[in-house]
Amino acid sequence: MKKNNLKYILFPWIKNTPQKKFSNLSLDSRKLTSKDVFIAIKGTKKDGNDFIFEAVKKRVVAILSETKEKKKHGEINYINNIPILSFFKLSEKISNLAARVYKEPAKTLKIIGVTGTNGKTTVTQLINQWSELLGKKIATMGTLGNGFYNALKTTKNTTSSAIDIQSFLHIAAKKKINLVTMEVSSHGLVQNRVKNIPFYIGIFTNLTQDHLDYHKNMKQYESAKWSFFSQHKIKKIILNANDKYAKKWLRKLSDKYTIAVTIQNEKQKKYSTKWINATGIKYNVNSTDVEFESSWGQGILSTCLIGYFNIQNLLLSFASMLEMNYKLSDLINTSIQLQPILGRMQKFDVFGKPKVIIDYAHTPDALKKALNAIKSYYKKKIWCIFGCGGERDQTKRPLMGSISEKIADRVIITNDNPRNENQNKIIKEIVQGCIKKEKIIIIPNREKAISSTFFKANIDDIIFISGKGHENQQIIKNKIINYSDQKVVIKLLEKKI
């Protein structure tokens, strides 16, 4: 990539910027080179301004330092001939700056952003699968990683940094990809990571309790999600209008192009530009048939995905495909070929052994919906294995304990990612929500919890393992341990018992 000119990148926000050539922007002082510009902003845990001298030692081209004082904006100081430019509300402009560095890649792409508490990964991956089935190559960013369908590189966050996003879009544009799906988290919205991105389609899945350690209350959490539709450029908005928040937003978005997606709730269509409504659902042994009516016509979608909530996810994906002008008949004919997403209601079924389902459900609402979905398909005993993450929203722990105890026949409480929090404290807080303590088994070691349950369960039983989904690591204190629920289950299923 050609070198960038600092003066051009910062115009018109800072006047008298020195003419400096540089290669990249960086938020991480550990990864700096002498060709970079260091962006020093306050993060959730650390403040980049504390690492300015480290950047100076690495002889960076320049440093942009976020200031809280408006009057200091545009001030330029020098240390060892390295300019340090004060920038008021810098974090809000990083997306713009990075877009300039990477030559505005979003302008050549159609970008679909998906936000919501649960379902972001499933919706993006269903769009990816469907596009591939119908002959279109697609790039994606999200929880499972960034990259191209079936070739993803693991990432730390659901929504990458503003700089990494623009870098990825630049790569996608160079490879002549013209469609990108992106999971948009509430953290990503609050931290302005997608601020400069023009979305062709914005999708909302649902809003339920999660991340209250970060957002403090549901009002702030709702505000973060709503900002996606109220403060960002989105050409077409698709809402799960069965959700109570979406119903409210649909009315507030009356001047926008909206698509209301509902299940047995046709009232919402009068508030939207276009609509899809599922009029009937038939659960079969290995599939589900979804009868629908819509602005595009009517028909039946068949799917092998498990659960009512996955019907919602399917319909949201369906709406986005229709909005990208795919033929209704082609989508109907290929819907049955869509496969379950890694770690999302992923079924393991071997003759003569208990059935196992692995899911990422780590919120009260997701756990409840997953367990109810299993109950609607299978009438035998349900064993539920789950834990809660450390250093995360503590208020959901007893709620998840209560939900699991009410729906499952036996509940095995174990570790998730305890991080630096005491594992026994986490487990105790989960148990506080349980009334029927005789249904509860506590096995902190996750692998032992799964294997113990596997050998206790009858072959007709269902073992539901929740919380980690696709993850292949476990965080205990400051150690990251290689661990995968899938690998543990496959190992058990392959054993000759």
From Swiss-Prot:
- Post-translational modification N6-carboxylysine, affected residues: 225
Per the Swiss-Prot or TrEMBL annotation, the motif Meso-diaminopimelate recognition motif is positioned at: 416-419
- Record field: catalytic activity: UDP-N-acetyl-alpha-D-muramoyl-L-alanyl-D-glutamate + meso-2,6-diaminopimelate + ATP = UDP-N-acetyl-alpha-D-muramoyl-L-alanyl-gamma-D-glutamyl-meso-2,6-diaminopimelate + ADP + phosphate + H(+)
**Pfam families from the xrefs?**
Mur_ligase, Mur_ligase_C, Mur_ligase_M
Could you state what the record's PTM comment says about this protein?
Carboxylation is probably crucial for Mg(2+) binding and, consequently, for the gamma-phosphate positioning of ATP.
Binding residues for meso-2,6-diaminopimelate: 392, 416-419, 467, 471
Q: Report the enzyme's class at the first EC level.
A: ligase
Does this entry carry the keyword Magnesium? yes
Q: Name one GO biological process term.
A: regulation of cell shape
Per its UniProt record, the required cofactor names are: Mg(2+)
Enzyme Commission code: 6.3.2.13
**Where found?**
Cytoplasm
Question: Residues that bind ATP, according to the entry?
Answer: 116-122
* Ligand binding (UDP-N-acetyl-alpha-D-muramoyl-L-alanyl-D-glutamate): 27, 29, 157-159, 185, 191, 193
- What pathway, per the record? Cell wall biogenesis; peptidoglycan biosynthesis
Please give the family membership noted in the entry. Belongs to the MurCDEF family. MurE subfamily.
Checking HAMAP family in the record gives: MurE
What function is annotated for this protein? Answer: Catalyzes the addition of meso-diaminopimelic acid to the nucleotide precursor UDP-N-acetylmuramoyl-L-alanyl-D-glutamate (UMAG) in the biosynthesis of bacterial cell-wall peptidoglycan.
NCBIfam families according to UniProt: murE (TIGR01085), PRK00139.1-1 (NF001123), PRK00139.1-4 (NF001126)
The identity of this protein, by name, is: UDP-N-acetylmuramoyl-L-alanyl-D-glutamate--2,6-diaminopimelate ligase
